[in-house]
Amino acid sequence: MRDAETQGLVLYSRNYKEKDKLVKIFTESFGKRMFFVKNFGKSPYASSLQAFTDGKLTATINDGGFSFIEDVSEVVVYKNISADIFINAHASYIISLADAAISDNQYDPALYGFLKRSLELLDQGFDMEVVTNIFELQVLHRFGVSLNFSECAFCHKTVGPFDFSYKFSGCLCPRHFDEDLRRSHLDPNVIYLINLFQEISLDELKKISIKAEMKAKIRQFIDGLYDEYVGIHLKSKKFLDGMSGWADIMK
């Protein structure tokens, strides 16, 4: 055990015994840790340990079991995420992806920062689907998946249009479409946007407008990539998928 200070982002909490809770926090300095909070309802930190909160932790870090919180300060609450069911669903999904992408206790300050920035953008009103797509694509390499959407897999031509081949795990230019008769037959703009999303920094992201039809094509393609190369099935993703028709109903 060791005492330490670190930034931490609450991923989720669950009941433990009658009055206690386990709170999973993605810390900047020590990776994802499970913290035991006794008598959670009476804890002075209860409001600071809700989902979608980030703060500075003073804690006892234990590599072999539960860690313990001594103090929480400088708390940031993502209020818009908590208040809007649609933003909440996207935020819950990317949190689940981050949780699945690395092992517990694994030091990964870059992923912590990427997740935090993604949640900030969602809370600020940036396009939910775009932020989620960017997160999905840029976290792929942590699942051991490296895909190049910027050039043809055969001739390395970098000017589109391109289509995607699962057979070759890469893009094909028109000259090489015949190499895979079962290529994806994508709208060329899908590959263009996928490549953009894979490379862009969230700090450079501007508010952009993408038509619903194109978003649906991108969603279908990314789902295909995850089915083929990652193979995880998250409850938060299933819930998000089930919300597709809610917007019209709730108008």
Swiss-Prot record:
InterPro entries in the cross-refs: ARFGAP/RecO, DNA_rep/recomb_RecO_N, NA-bd_OB-fold, RecO, RecO_C
This protein's GO CC annotations: bacterial nucleoid
Swiss-Prot/TrEMBL GO biological process terms: DNA recombination; double-strand break repair
The entry's keywords: DNA damage, DNA recombination, DNA repair
Keyword Cytoplasm in annotation: no
UniProt cross-references to NCBIfam families, sorted A to Z: reco (TIGR00613)
Role this protein plays: Involved in DNA repair and RecF pathway recombination.
Record PANTHER family: DNA REPAIR PROTEIN RECO (PTHR33991:SF1)
Entry similarity comment: Belongs to the RecO family.
Full protein name: DNA repair protein RecO
